Regions:
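Short amphipathic alpha-helix that is part of the acyltransferase structural core
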Residues: 1-38, 44-60, 81
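Conserved GNAT acetyl-CoA-binding A-motif
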Residues: 101, 106-119
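A conserved beta-turn-beta hairpin within the catalytic core of GNAT-like acetyltransferases
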Residues: 69-82, 92
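Short coil/turn connectors at secondary-structure junctions
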Residues: 77, 96, 113-114
Length: 119
């Protein structure tokens, strides 16, 4: 796989099943998929940035950045949390995770986000 052939785009509600499939295959269990489902349903985490990586029409990676806040900060800086990052096993260790992180950071920077924490 060549990273230049990978399309990274914002995930939509139509991509829900593909996102869940990537999460389950990447982690080998439902835990991360349930986390993603819960975060996508959490209105306090909006606006979130959910990106899907596709190769030859197949969803192969997903990353989620959720809005967060820092208690005690007034005013609170614009903060997001990166969790989770998932890549199907057969596409791991080829730079796809880094590609998703870079694209997510680019979008967050355009949004004026000041900090990103990784869980």
């Amino acid at each position: 796989m060549n990273l230049n052939d990978v399309q990274v785009r914002r995930a939509t509600s139509d991509d829900f099943n593909d996102v869940m499939n990537v999460e389950r295959l990447a982690f080998g269990e439902d835990g991360e998929a349930v986390l993603v489902e819960d975060l996508l349903a959490d209105q306090t985490a909006e606006p979130y940035v959910s990106l899907l990586a596709c190769y030859q029409g197949e969803a192969i990676g997903h990353i989620l950045f959720s809005k967060a806040s820092l208690e005690g900060s007034n005013p609170s800086p614009s903060v997001y949390i990166l969790a989770p990052l998932a890549v199907k096993p057969e596409y791991q260790k080829q730079g796809l995770g880094g590609l998703l992180i870079r694209e997510g950071h680019r979008i967050l920077k355009e949004m004026g986000v000041e900090m990103v924490f990784v869980l």
